[in-house]
Amino acid sequence: MKGRQGERVRLYVRGTVLGYKRSKSNQYPNTSLIQIEGVNTQEEVNWYKGKRLAYIYKAKTKKNGSHYRCIWGKVTRPHGNSGVVRSKFTSNLPPKSMGARVRVFMYPSNI
């Protein structure tokens, strides 16, 4: 029997898009706020600085043989004291991404 044996291994951590960085009346869509699963303090966020993010979504038309597309980003800094991070994406995240999942990859490593 050919194929993969054993359990599947996930090489990323799940995160949730909370929204754009904002003030009381303005929002700044070039910076997005992400809550990473299992990260609850500002000290834990420091390990994720510089790590790559991917927002994967499904489109109606095919491009390069796939309906799935991806917007890449990078964790830039912490936001507050409860494990939320600020991140910048290559193009601003669409409004439908609020509450959606992102993948937080374990590279580039700074160990």
Swiss-Prot record:
Transmembrane intervals: none
Keyword Nucleus: no
A GO BP entry: translation
Species in which this protein is naturally found: Arabidopsis thaliana
Gene3D superfamilies linked to this entry: translation elongation factor selb, chain A, domain 4 (2.40.10.190)
Family (UniProt): Belongs to the eukaryotic ribosomal protein eL33 family.
UniProt keywords, alphabetically: Ribonucleoprotein, Ribosomal protein
One example GO MF annotation: mRNA binding
Protein name: Large ribosomal subunit protein eL33z
InterPro entries according to UniProt: Ribosomal_eL33, Ribosomal_eL33_CS, Ribosomal_eL33_sf, Transl_B-barrel_sf
Top-level taxon: Eukaryota
UniProt GO cellular component terms: cytosolic large ribosomal subunit; nucleus
Coiled coil: none
Pfam families registered for this protein in UniProt: Ribosomal_L35Ae
Gene for this chain: RPL35AB
SUPFAM superfamilies found in the cross-reference section: Translation proteins (SSF50447)
